[in-house]
Amino acid sequence: MQILFVASEVGPWSKTGGLGDVAGALPQALAERGNEVAVVTPRHGSIDPHAAGLQPVRTALHVRGEPVALWVKRGPAPVYFVEHPHLFGSRRGLYGEGGRDHGDNAERFAFLTRAALALPAALGLRPRILHLNDWQCGLGPWLLRHEHARDPALAGARTVFTIHNLAYQGLFPKQVLPALGLPWEVFRWEAMEFFDQLSFMKAGLAFADALTTVSPTYAREILTPEGGASLDALLRHRARDLHGILNGIDVHAWDPARDPHLPAHFGAGDLTGKAACKAALQREVGLPVRPEVPVAGLVTRLAEQKGIDLVAAALPALLARDVQVVLLGSGDAAYEQAFARAAREHPDRVAARIGFDEGLAHRIEAGADLFLMPSRFEPCGLNQMYSLRYGTVPVVRAVGGLADTVEDFDGFARGTGFRFSEYTPQALLTATRRALDVFRDRRAWRGLVERGMAEDNSWERSAARYEALYRTLAPGR
């Protein structure tokens, strides 16, 4: 089956979060299953074509009469990079700079989507599925119906629109409609109008043939007023078309038996290397090397969506136990300062690294005993799956993908982690104390570790589910 996959970021070339991870991995997994997949994304200013090994493509690609240059990264699922010197090439941030969105994001991502829809005719492709991701590509289903209705390259193509985070809705003043080349008729409540603004997210939800999101639990949560970000009524109307498909992880990049970022390697059958990773992590972050003390790790954005307010509130009581905490992350300045202060006040118990370091993120996953993810909401989450693979027991709030990937320990021989429901510091503290108590029971803890490491969270599993959905939309193709 031919699939055109469109995303505003694609790892490893451009990434601000989970969307980049998905766009970098899912098309490759689909290609490995025998599908013909092409990926379309902007050539952001941060991407050096020559350093990235991109090749120019000679093609007659035009968007609203304007010629568009194209680059490609060859591979099983080739990635096409759309060039626009002003809209993308001259920008540092993918969506904004200095904490503010780019003022022309509506024009930027309307351009990307139009370029993606024009690409099949220019390259001789005949995709049966257009897989469009998040608000940046939300205009795609409407544009397919109204601007490409007679395009033979897209005849019969069906659209899949994936919600990676419903909180980001692509909201713009209605006055941008003429600049986008959209008629005023789309500015209706049953189309793209959202509280007197234009919503790219709502456009995708209203016009795509099928909707997906990144975990089954999140798919249920967004149907409710509490989780639906004021789009729950539309989503309930389209509930039969909504599918929750859990994200996967890159099991090659995240493999404790081969990870180049680790000082020692290990697997479920021999955890000696994990003990060595723990000692090395303690040394690296300046904590006393004490193998008997549980290490709790966090690799997170310091924002309330991630539950960091719960961690900050629970930390003093948590430190009453004999435990070490290692945090890596950046975000809200108040939380950066709070954890830096905690590290100064408890230098033998708390280590805080403000910023991001890919290698250290891997070493925390490998060296910690437990991993805290108390998110307020979490569409899917990746770190809990990394933790399971690395034998690090997750303590999570039972929301979104966290609820789908971590089974609560039953006190005997079932479960892969520890879950809590209430969004309170006390609930986090209670779950973490449960984990610390079980840590002292080496046999029970070993069972938790081994069950977690046996979980299959690969992209192969997720790709099979997407492929099944595609075939219901375009059978026999």
From Swiss-Prot:
Q: In which pathway does it act?
A: Glycan biosynthesis; glycogen biosynthesis
User: Is Chloroplast there in the keyword field?
Assistant: no
Top enzyme class, one word, equals: transferase
GO BP annotations listed: glycogen biosynthetic process
- Ligand binding (ADP-alpha-D-glucose): K15
In Pfam terms, one family for this protein is: Glyco_transf_5
* Reaction equation(s) it catalyzes: [(1->4)-alpha-D-glucosyl](n) + ADP-alpha-D-glucose = [(1->4)-alpha-D-glucosyl](n+1) + ADP + H(+)
Q: What's its job? A: Synthesizes alpha-1,4-glucan chains using ADP-glucose.
The record's section on NCBIfam families has: glgA (TIGR02095), PRK00654.1-2 (NF001899)
Q: Which family does it belong to?
A: Belongs to the glycosyltransferase 1 family. Bacterial/plant glycogen synthase subfamily.
Q: What is this protein called?
A: Glycogen synthase
Q: Which organism is it from?
A: Anaeromyxobacter dehalogenans (strain 2CP-1 / ATCC BAA-258)
Question: What is the name of the gene encoding this protein?
Answer: glgA
